[in-house]
């Protein structure tokens, strides 16, 4: 029941954005939900992950990242979630005008703003990506360490495990 207080420990930022947020942020007049939903006969994780392309495109500005976190927390608050951990791959938002630290700081600010508005305590889990270079993933590890206890609570490894098995990431795990 909605009235029961809840904890949400596995929430993907890019997979939890509301249709309204995506339409407003991407300035869309319509949104075909099939573009962000995996088909019932999805054949692989790699195919499934293509559903995140559109939501990730909405996370390319500091304000959009902040507002995305607030959007996801708003939805959780409506379900009486009291604590949540939102995971996302910050390197997917790095671009010519947004570095890794600014991406994470924007998400942390979104957590703070959402707490002030909805009273849901939120931490972030930064995801290194299996298809990214070792250098990119080491930067994510360092950033997670920098923000640990200040909005970030953990590090994760995400992506297509079949194409990039765990053995490829031994050095990354040792660093973490």
Language model features with spans:
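Metal-cofactor-binding active-site regions of metalloenzymes
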Residues: 1-176
């Amino acid at each position: 029941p909605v009235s029961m207080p809840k904890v949400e420990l596995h929430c993907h930022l890019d997979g939890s954005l509301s249709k309204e947020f995506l339409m407003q942020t991407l300035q869309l007049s319509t949104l075909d939900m099939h573009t962000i939903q995996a088909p019932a006969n999805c054949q692989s994780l790699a195919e499934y992950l293509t559903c995140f392309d559109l939501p990730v495109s909405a996370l390319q500005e500091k304000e959009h990242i902040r507002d995305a976190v607030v959007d996801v927390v708003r939805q959780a608050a409506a379900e009486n979630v009291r604590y949540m951990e939102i995971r996302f791959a910050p390197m997917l938002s790095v671009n010519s005008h947004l570095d890794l630290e600014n991406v994470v700081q924007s998400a942390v600010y979104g957590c703070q703003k959402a707490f002030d508005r909805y009273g849901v305590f939120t931490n972030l889990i930064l995801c290194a990506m299996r298809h990214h270079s070792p250098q990119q993933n080491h930067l994510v590890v360092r950033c997670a360490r920098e923000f640990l206890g200040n909005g970030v609570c953990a590090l994760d490894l995400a992506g297509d495990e079949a194409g990039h098995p765990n053995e490829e990431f031994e050095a990354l795990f040792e660093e973490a």
